[in-house]
Amino acid sequence: DYPLSSKIYKKFKGKKKIIGICLGFQQILFSEGASIIEQNKIYHGFQSEVLVNKSSKLFDRGRKFKVGRYHSLKLKEPFAAENFDITMRCVISGAAMSFENNIDKIYGFQFHPESFLTLNGKLLIKKILSA
């Protein structure tokens, strides 16, 4: 699905607000030149704590909260793309858990904000929709 999804992503980049969740997070970063790799541990139905870092423009910097994870792949780091900032990381593993591109209005979560395992998931989506 990546080739077709990447084509659609590139068509709307900078024209429409884009939110990538889980595989969408991976697909957007892949389209921006990132490598996506297998994790040592698979997280299906797993709750992890994340930390919002200083580069976030949307979320409370320094805040920790729990999120629902359902994935076996992750972003290979280091990763750098113009206007993309990794804004949340898993407290335990340090894995990238969200990004923001506030210029093109592109956002992504490696976790599932809609999951009952994610605390305040609706608030996360509302903040992106109002950005």
Which functions belong to the PLM regions below?
Residues 1, 43, 121:
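Conserved donor sugar-nucleotide recognition element shared by glycan-biosynthetic enzymes
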Residues 1-20, 32, 117, 126:
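Flexible gly/pro-rich beta->alpha loop and the following alpha-helix that scaffold active-site loops
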Residues 17-19, 35, 66, 105:
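Proline-centered loop/turn at the N-terminus of a beta-strand
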Residues 56-103:
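Catalytic beta-strand/loop cores that center a nucleophilic Ser/Cys/Thr
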Residues 85-131:
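C-terminal and late-domain segments of enzyme folds
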